Every structure is written in C-alpha cells, then in structure tokens.
C-alpha cells in the first residue's frame, strides 16, 4: 500500500493543482453525509520499533545471577520483537504492556546493566529518514523503560489505525468505533505526554548528542502527543458527519483537529536539530492531516454560509479550502489511502465551488470577499488519558 518514496520537505507547500472535474451527482449540504466515503486514516509511524535480541558471549551454567536475570529479561523483551507485524494488534499491545511491567520491576535487580557492564540492550529506530532502521543502545534501565513505553504507546496508535481503516472499509466508524478509536489514540497521547514530561528529561544528560534515537527525545514525544490527539479529534469529526451534525459544528471540530496537527508540524520544523532526520511518512502525514482538516473546516463553513444564502462567502471559503488541498497534494501521494481521500476531498471542494459560482452568476450577484469570513472558533473535544505507571507484581526470576 506504500507508494514510491520521494524527497519531500514539509516546510514548503507544494504547488500541485487540484482536479476540478465535475462530479456526477450533486454534492452540497444535503448530500455530504451520503457521498463522503473517505477520511484521513492515521498510521502507526513507529510501526517497526523493536528491541533487538541481547547477544551473549558464552552460554553456561556458571553465569552469575545477574546474567541469569538479564537472560530472563531478554526473553521478555524478545516477545515484543514481532509485535508490529502481528496480525492481531491487541496481541502486540499485551506483549509490550507485559514488558513495561517487567522492565520497571527489574530496576535494582540488574545494576550491571545500569552501570554499562555486560551486554548492551539495543532498539531499532523507525522514525528517521532512510530506508533502513538504525540501531541504538538503551542508556541503562531508564532508557530501556523509555523505549518500551514508546513501543507500548505505538501499539495503541496501531490499534487506532487498524480499527479506523477496518470500520471505514465497512462504511463508517459508528458510535462504538469512534469511541474505541478515539480512546486508543488518547491513551497513546497520555503515554507520550508522560514520556515528554516525566521520563525523558532526566535521561537527556546521559545521552550521546550524536547518537540519540528519535524516540528518546522529549520533542519527538511532544510531536507524537499532538498527532495522537489529532487522530482522536479526527474520529470525532467523522462521527459528527455520520450523525448529520450541523455544518458549523463540523467546521469547529475540523478546525480543532487542524490546529493540533499544525502545532505538531511546528515542532517538527523548529526542533529539527534534535533528531537524526525524520521519516518522510511522519512529516508528510502531519502535513496532509493538517491541511485536509483545514480544507474540511472551510468546506463545512461554506456549507453553513450557503444555507444562509451568503453565496459570496461560500465562494471565498471554497477558495481557502482549495488552497489547503493544494498545499498537501504532493505529500498525500506517500500513502494510497491518503491519495484516495485527497482526491475525494478535492472533488467535493471543486463541486461546491462550481455550484456556488453558478448560483452567484445567475441568482445572487454578491461580491466575493477576500479572504472571507473567518472560521468559527475551534472545538477540541479530546484530551490525553493520563498514564499512571502500574505497580508490577514480583516475578520469580527477579527474586532472591
């Protein structure tokens, strides 16, 4: 499902023209719910974040107790290695959940690992530019715990992404689907926020400035928090459309989602020196989500103005929507589902714009304002679900 990669800079808006092909049937306020079959589908950007197996120089019964415990820890972390590719996303979540508990309780039992003695635990990072994942060492147990928690949060994002795609393939999210997708995204946001504010800042001093995984930077955790909240807000936008909510409410919801992704993009652009490059899917995905939600907001705003017979404002809002669609035309080509949604959105915008222009030429004769009335105030209806570390039960291989 992945298109061919190309060099892409999210800081520059592409100038691709959108299609203005006339639709086969009327697309307006009364038909929006019936004809809108697509939405921005979130993806798990850390789709392959995995722990690498710890290699031991020799096997033998004479290993110290610490190394026996390290082997037991390695067995627990190895179960996470194939979580990203597992057919059942919930299985991967349970594996990471188990490992987060295990690594938390291991503190104090594996002092050698914290002192940098013995084998090094490494992780394959997938949030960098380039085709191959780069391997990074975990700086002690605290770093290992941070990697594991990032992986667990990514599992919740994977659950959100897979359920969203599955339900949309069946025709829509529905109440239960919207609630479930939103909850997983909000749980992920809470974990990323916990990493950003609590786990990662104390690690900064112990990290090698030229050899730091993107997953161990507070700025990347902030980006992922905002993206996850944007995905949760996107589920609310879709459900509002399915329910036939008023155009003004849909405009406010889409504006809220757009601003969350806009803020994520701002962090990506301003904190570039924190990272060893950023994967193109991440930069492109944030731009596509930001601009398509902005276009949806202006389109809903245009529908509301059309209902009030403000044809000039309708045309102005459609022009703003067209600008937003153009801004992400190139980026949308990175994923097939994004390109499909982008084309469908462009068609809806062009159809309403053509309808409004014709009505204005024949009936209303209104002046077209520039830039037109502003969008209604954003309505952000989601927030992160606070992550509270659990008290792990004591396992026998860390006893004695």
Annotate each predicted stretch with a short phrase.
Residues 144, 151, 158, 221, ...:
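"A position-specific structural signal for the A-helix of alpha-solenoid helical repeats
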Residues 36-138, 215, 242-249, 269-400:
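Eukaryotic intrinsically disordered, low-complexity segments enriched for acidic and Ser/Thr/Pro residues
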Residues 214-273, 277-278:
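Alpha-helical scaffold segments of alpha-solenoid architecture
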Residues 198-210, 267-281:
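Short, solvent-exposed, charged loop/turn and helix-capping segments
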Residues 148, 153, 160, 185-192, ...:
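Structural signal for hydrophobic/aromatic residues that build the beta-strand cores
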Residues 127-132, 137-138, 157-195, 200-213, ...:
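Short coil/linker segments at helix-helix boundaries
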């Amino acid at each position: 499902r992945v298109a061919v990669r190309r060099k892409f800079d999210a800081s520059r808006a592409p100038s691709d023209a959108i299609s203005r092909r006339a639709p086969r049937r009327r697309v307006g306020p009364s038909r929006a719910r019936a004809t809108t079959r697509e939405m921005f589908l979130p993806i798990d950007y850390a789709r392959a974040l995995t722990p690498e197996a710890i290699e031991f120089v020799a096997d033998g019964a004479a290993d110290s107790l610490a190394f026996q415990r390290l082997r037991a820890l390695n067995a627990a972390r190895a179960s996470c290695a194939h979580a990203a590719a597992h057919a059942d996303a919930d299985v991967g979540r349970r594996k990471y959940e188990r490992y987060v508990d295990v690594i938390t309780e291991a503190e104090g039992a594996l002092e050698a690992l914290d002192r940098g003695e013995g084998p090094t635990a490494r992780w394959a990072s997938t949030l960098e530019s380039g085709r191959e994942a780069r391997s990074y060492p975990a700086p002690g147990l605290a770093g290992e715990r941070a990697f594991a928690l990032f992986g667990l949060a990514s599992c919740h994002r994977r659950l959100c992404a897979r359920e969203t795609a599955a339900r949309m393939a069946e025709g829509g999210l529905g109440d239960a689907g919207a609630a479930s997708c939103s909850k997983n995204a909000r749980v992920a946001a809470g974990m990323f926020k916990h990493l950003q504010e609590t786990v990662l800042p104390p690690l900064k001093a112990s990290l090698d400035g030229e050899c730091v995984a993107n997953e161990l930077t507070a700025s990347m955790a902030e980006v992922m928090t905002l993206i996850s909240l944007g995905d949760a807000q996107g589920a609310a936008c879709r459900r509002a459309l399915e329910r036939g909510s008023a155009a003004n409410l849909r405009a406010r919801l889409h504006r809220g989602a757009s601003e969350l992704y806009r803020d994520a993009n701002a962090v990506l652009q301003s904190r570039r020196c924190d990272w060893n490059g950023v994967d193109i899917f991440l930069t492109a995905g944030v731009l596509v989500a930001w601009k398509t939600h902005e276009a949806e907001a202006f389109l809903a705003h245009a529908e509301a103005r059309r209902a009030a017979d403000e044809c000039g404002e309708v045309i102005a809002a459609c022009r703003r929507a067209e600008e937003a669609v153009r801004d992400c035309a190139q980026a949308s080509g990175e994923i097939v589902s994004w390109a499909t949604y982008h084309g469908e959105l462009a068609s809806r915008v062009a159809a309403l714009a053509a309808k409004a222009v014709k009505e204005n030429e024949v009936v209303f004769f209104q002046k077209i304002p520039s830039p037109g009335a502003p969008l209604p105030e954003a309505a952000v209806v989601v927030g992160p679900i606070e992550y509270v570390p659990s008290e792990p039960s004591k396992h026998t291989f860390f006893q004695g």
